[in-house]
Amino acid sequence: MNKFRTFPQINTLIEDESLKSYPFYIKVFFCKKVVAKLKENFSQDEISKDKLLLEIKKEIKTFYRKDLQSVINASGVVIHTNLGRSVIHEELYEACKDIICNYSNVEFDLENGKRGSRYALVLEKLKMLFECEDALVVNNNAAAVFLVLNSLCYDKEVISSRGELVEIGGSFRVPEVIKAAGVKLCEVGTSNKTHLKDYEQAIGENTALILKTHKSNFALMGFHSEVNIKDLHELAKEKGLLSYYDLGSGWCENLNEKLIKNEPKIKKLVQECDILSFSGDKLFGSAQAGIILGKKELIEKLKQNQLLRMLRVDKLTLSFLNESLKAYLQKDYKKIITLKLLNDDLSFIEKKALRVQKELNFQTQLKKSKSLVGGGSMPDKSLDTYILTFQGDALKLQTRFRKENIIGRIENDEFVLDFRTIRENELQKLILTINQMENL
């Protein structure tokens, strides 16, 4: 006797009127999934069709909830890695749309009708902007670090300060990347102090490169010292070695003056080392990419590495990066949203907060607070901001707002919305969404 005879047929579930609005492939998948799950935990109790349909609809709603969707970033973290880091300006997107939605000359030379370079147009703009000999783009800065080390130092040794052997989000650790690239690591100095003589004394027959890694996601305070890249480059040059700066998150132009103290500018650094790399979607404010700048002969070696094929970027990334570079070269900084959010003055942020507060149906308090740069950038710096605080259980409010795709934060046991990271074009949507929420 079939013990599952009480189960409704899959077809009857799929064809039920209550599932009519869902796509066929969604209905088939979740009807089968729920029935299989119940069969695994089968009891002798009769399984009703209504109970199954209820579970199927619950699964479908959870599935849709997990889909990629836009959110309002009210966290106060400008370059929020979990929320996609830098936002692309609508005008840049419109400029890219014709290329993205059609065939393009991504790797085709329109002059001679032959295969062209995937990177040519972007690389010329990178050289213009940063005044470097040559450049290359890969899919992120971790890939850039791996490619540089594997291409220039394979089976050899690199020297790095113990205080710069960083770990970033997702357990990306510099020592492990060095090892994976087929390179031996020589650690020098201590966690808080490293001197030029430490590097000099560590140089041996198998040394190929001196590596400096910018501490972009943590800060050392108090009794500490490090060697700048210029001095490391001079030492490397004297000893016939290479110097490489893994910058991680560097700034280019027009950044808030409160943030730039002790923060290296890319254009200056590229003149002080043989090769450097940084992320395209952090302080640079563009698409995810690993941007490599440096000496022409070194970049040529990177281009010859078979790994480059695996690390190359697609036409979407190239399109967005190309338009961002145009904006920088034309000094049209308003199109770089990350810069705008970091540069917005306090009075502008206050106006946004007051507008929302005025139109909300709920009691809130306007307060001054601090925003963060985020994205593993400038951990020791913050920016003045205005927040709205909401009365009630902070954790419950945070969850309730998150269900409406509004990502706030908890500060001093209060749920708050930070208006530095809420864009002007999101204010009306924010007001309508909050006013439609019940039982706040």
Swiss-Prot record:
Its EC number is 2.9.1.1. GO terms for cellular component: cytoplasm. It comes from Campylobacter jejuni (strain RM1221). InterPro entries: PyrdxlP-dep_Trfase, PyrdxlP-dep_Trfase_major, SelA-like, SelA_trans. SUPFAM superfamilies: PLP-dependent transferases. It is an enzyme of class 2 (transferase). Keywords: Cytoplasm, Protein biosynthesis, Pyridoxal phosphate, Selenium, Transferase. This is L-seryl-tRNA(Sec) selenium transferase. It comes from the Bacteria. Pfam families: SelA. Pathway: Aminoacyl-tRNA biosynthesis; selenocysteinyl-tRNA(Sec) biosynthesis; selenocysteinyl-tRNA(Sec) from L-seryl-tRNA(Sec) (bacterial route): step 1/1. Gene3D superfamilies: 3.90.1150.180, Type I PLP-dependent aspartate aminotransferase-like (Major domain).
